[in-house]
Structures are given as structure tokens and as C-alpha cells.
Amino acid sequence: MQPINTFQAKAVALPIENIDTDQIIPARYLKVTDKNGLGEALFTDWRGEPDFVLNQPYAQGAGVLIAGHNFGCGSSREHAPWALQGFGFQAVISTYFADIFKGNALKNGLLPIVVDAPTLARLTEQCLANQTIDVSVDLENQQVHVAGETISFPIDAFSKHCLLHGVDQLGYIQAQETAIQAYEASHAARVNTVGA
């Protein structure tokens, strides 16, 4: 997983509420265990429509998706963040993410950014009026910068640490190996394990 600190990207808007994981990537793609190429399957059932936003030339190279409320609802599938990342998205902005999707996204290095409804409406409007908008994301300070506006967003400390350092949960534990061994050694010396 690549570390995330700050990045700049263009954003595209997909202002549809309740986009579920089957719409993000249909179940027929879940047999694949290789992330490569999944970006081509992102929203595949909608990509047949010529007017779909991700089919437009201006959407190519977009790194931020501005989505509607309740993004990623439905069944758990790690393939959903994989497909979003495969297309090139580094972050998704919404007012709410389904818990399972949010967890899968964070564990795979995709940043789910939660904003309030008026902010989402404003960003969506700006994006639709201009096709794309330029966005700067600063994870360290938990801020998004758009058109001279600074928007703060919440993220839990553990997820933030993992994203900043480019590690998943296992990588985090492995990085603590020396401290864990030192604790175990000192703990074993203090605890009587005879008869245990």
C-alpha cells in the first residue's frame, strides 16, 4: 500500500445516492483475486451508457470521486475499493459511507472523505458546472482544498496513521515487533506461569 499524505487531483461528480457495491463492481467480477484490471470493471453496468460520467474524456485521470449520500452500501466486497483505485481514484467524497465499505477502503489505501450535506452539494454543483474541479487533499491536517476553500474532514487516528505510513493492519503490527517482543519478555519475567 502506498502512503498517502498530500495529493492533488481533478475530481468528477457522480451525484447518485445509495450507490451500492454491486453497482460499483458487479458480483460476476468477485472471483478475481488480482487487483489488476479491475478499474475497467468499475461501474461496468453503467458504462454502457454513452453519457455516463466516467466515459467522458474529461473524467480520464480523475483522482477524486464526488459521490452521493450513502456510498458503498450493500454487501461487503474488497473489490469495490480495488476497482475505484484501478480507475485511478485516491479518494471518494460523500456525506456518508457504509461502514463495511469504509473499512475496506481504508484497509486498501482509498481515502473516504466525509463532508456535510451543504458542502457536498456545493462541491457537486461546482464540479457539474465545470465538468471537473481541482482538489488538493491534505491527510496530515485532515483538509481538502477546493477553489480557495478549506474543508476539514474526520478520520480516526489509527486509520490516519496507517494511510500516512502506507501500512495495513498487519503491517502496523509487524512494525511493532520489537516493542511486542520487549513487552512479552518483561511480562514473562513478572508472571508465574508454573502450572498454567
Curated annotation (Swiss-Prot):
UniProt keyword Ribonucleoprotein present: no
Keyword Lyase: yes
SUPFAM superfamilies: LeuD/IlvD-like
Keywords: Amino-acid biosynthesis, Branched-chain amino acid biosynthesis, Leucine biosynthesis, Lyase
Pathways per UniProt: Amino-acid biosynthesis; L-leucine biosynthesis; L-leucine from 3-methyl-2-oxobutanoate: step 2/4
One GO cellular component, as annotated: 3-isopropylmalate dehydratase complex
GO BP annotation list: L-leucine biosynthetic process
A molecular function GO annotation: 3-isopropylmalate dehydratase activity
Catalysed transformations (reactions): (2R,3S)-3-isopropylmalate = (2S)-2-isopropylmalate
Stated family: Belongs to the LeuD family. LeuD type 1 subfamily.
NCBIfam families: leuD, PRK01641.1
Purpose of the protein: Catalyzes the isomerization between 2-isopropylmalate and 3-isopropylmalate, via the formation of 2-isopropylmaleate.
Protein name: 3-isopropylmalate dehydratase small subunit
